[in-house]
């Protein structure tokens, strides 16, 4: 917040999302907030069952390590993309979802206004991070962010993917929301760099080129509309 400094806003309420006020505001002065990278010291806020399950898994693994003196490192992956990703499951990742839509001649569907930011990291960099964590004891008993460290808006992701696939399709901004989604999420990877020597090597544009080359041999089904219908049925989007 420009007035109050660094703050930790609560999850956006359904009432706020229904009025299409996408950005979180300062809990003290009400001003619009500018997102910053999330480091590992930030309290874990679980706005969805999925998020809570990830938190519980991490805590169980770290507790197992402490209890039985077993080396455990919890890696917090951000938005992974790359070859061999499931393309016909609309819940597996936005890059795969967009690719499936484009390959079936449909425009990518984006929730909210498309300006929400995420941290996309190549599966190749994630594999390197896993190897580093297994080969070093520097981070035993810790949780570390694994991402690219470079935020990008969802609308930009759709546009770059369409260009890489030589498509003139433009993303559809649904102006709908998904309950539990955070507005922005991108990681501070300083700790992983310091403790493991982790440095992302795959630029997003290069990773997309590799993904598109692999896509040429795939025949995905576009099930995005089915996903939206399921979310609507359970009251998780509007």
Model-assigned labels for residue ranges:
Residues 1-29, 220-238:
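Intrinsically disordered, low-complexity acidic/proline-/asparagine-rich linker or regulatory tail/stalk regions
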Residues 4, 8-17, 25-34, 49-51, ...:
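NAD(P)-dependent short-chain dehydrogenase/reductase
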Residues 31-32, 103-238:
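C-terminal substrate-binding subdomain of Rossmann-fold SDR/epimerase-dehydratase oxidoreductases
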Residues 38:
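P-loop NTPase nucleotide-binding/switch module
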Residues 41-45:
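A recurrent flexible, glycine/aromatic-enriched loop bordering the glycosyltransferase active site
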Residues 58, 62, 234-237:
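Short amphipathic alpha-helical "recognition" segments used for binding
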